[in-house]
């Protein structure tokens, strides 16, 4: 498997270029190949955990299962930590982190009525989000690591496929009309 920490450091050393929005978004979407490599390496422990958590109906029990798994397994996963670091580097290197992400995420939560749902980020990732919505949700997840590091929101979103679904939305909306809309609302 690739050393994702090393790749992240290599990306950070690339001289800044004046790339178009489309080129920058395509650089972000390339991250999906690294996700696939990581997912293909899942051991039986990971797969059985995902199945178990999907089947759990009791929200409190689900929360405990997730927390224990994050603490005992994911926090020690060097490759997942590397993916997290790599994605953060890509977001900042290519200036794809949305400054007003909270505003857009709150509008999204209202739009899809997910305010009180515990796994609202995962639910939103399964929607057909436009570029601004998808980048805002991705930025929200990345920034949430700062105030809730113990619960590993960004790493867990990478692990459980939420980030991949967001990137799929981005990939599906890289076109002239969506990019023009993004340029209007995002300050560089």
Tell me what each language-model feature is.
Residues 140, 144-187:
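Amphipathic alpha-helical binding modules
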Residues 74, 78-116:
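Intrinsically disordered, low-complexity linker/tail regions enriched in Pro/Ser/Thr
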Residues 120-132:
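Short, charge/polar-rich alpha-helical segments
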Residues 45-47, 53-82, 129-156:
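Acidic, low-complexity, intrinsically disordered interaction modules
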Residues 40, 95-99, 112-114, 128-129, ...:
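Alpha-helix capping and inter-helical loop/turn segments
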Residues 2-47, 68, 84, 88-92, ...:
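Short terminal alpha-helical segments
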Residues 27, 65, 86-88, 137-141, ...:
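Amphipathic alpha-helical elements of HEAT/ARM-like alpha-solenoid repeat scaffolds that form extended
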């Amino acid at each position: 498997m690739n050393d994702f920490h090393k790749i992240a450091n290599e990306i950070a050393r690339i001289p800044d270029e004046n790339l178009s929005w489309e080129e920058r978004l395509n650089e972000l979407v390339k991250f999906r190949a690294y996700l696939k490599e990581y997912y293909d390496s899942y051991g039986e422990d990971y797969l059985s955990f995902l199945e178990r958590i999907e089947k759990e109906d009791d929200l409190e029990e689900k929360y405990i299962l997730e927390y224990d798994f994050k603490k005992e397994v994911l926090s020690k996963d060097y490759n997942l930590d590397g993916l997290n670091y790599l994605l953060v580097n890509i977001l900042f290197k290519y200036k794809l982190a949305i400054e007003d992400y909270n505003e857009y995420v709150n509008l999204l939560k209202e739009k899809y009525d997910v305010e009180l749902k515990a796994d609202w980020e995962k639910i939103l990732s399964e929607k057909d989000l436009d570029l601004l919505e998808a980048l805002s949700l991705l930025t929200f997840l990345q920034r949430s690591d700062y105030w809730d590091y113990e619960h590993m929101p960004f790493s867990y979103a990478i692990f459980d496929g939420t980030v991949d679904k967001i990137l799929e939305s981005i990939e599906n909306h890289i076109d002239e009309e969506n990019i023009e809309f993004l340029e209007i609302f995002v300050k560089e």
